[in-house]
Amino acid sequence: MRLKETIEAYRRNDPAARSGWEVFWLYNGLHATMYYRVAHWLYEHRLRFLGRWVSQFARRRTGIEIHPAAKIGRRLVIDHGTGIVIGETAEIGDDCLLYQNVTLGGTGMTNGKRHPTLGNNVMVGSGAKVLGPFKVGDNARIAANSVVLREVPPNATVVGVPGRVVRRNGEKLDHIHTPDPVRLELDALYARIEKLEEKLKEDQDVSL
């Protein structure tokens, strides 16, 4: 892991990070990924028990559980790192951002690929669950508390339970300013009511 570039990624994504030293000493998310790199190396070199031991030690220290077999790219940022779960066959690209209580989980008890693959520059908002062996495309945004159960195209924004795509223009969003799915449904309902009222008025004018 290139530690310096990862620390810089934290500083870019978190306005509260005042210095690189602060990130290095105080950020649980960074510590969890450092432990993961050690655990993953052990796991890849057939020292699987030791790899699992390191990952469980890291879970107790940081509150973040990353299976040592998971594949994680460069400059991963875990902000407010508590309650993160990253499963055994999960894959994460470069420059991704995860907030607290995110789960990259599997479905079922089958062998083989069970967990999601995140592309590059993917943001997953707090409390979101991404469950299953599918791809989340580059530059995708998943809103807080969404539950995503199927593939997400690149440059898309997903909200809701179950998650659905509401934007595909690649506009930069964060986990606070993603669209409210209830508001979107209400706006659509109001638009339908207005159309019905206009049609009703037209029908009344014709009958007169």
Task: Name these PLM-found stretches.
Residues R59-V166:
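Structural signal for interior beta-strand "rungs" in well-ordered beta-sheet cores
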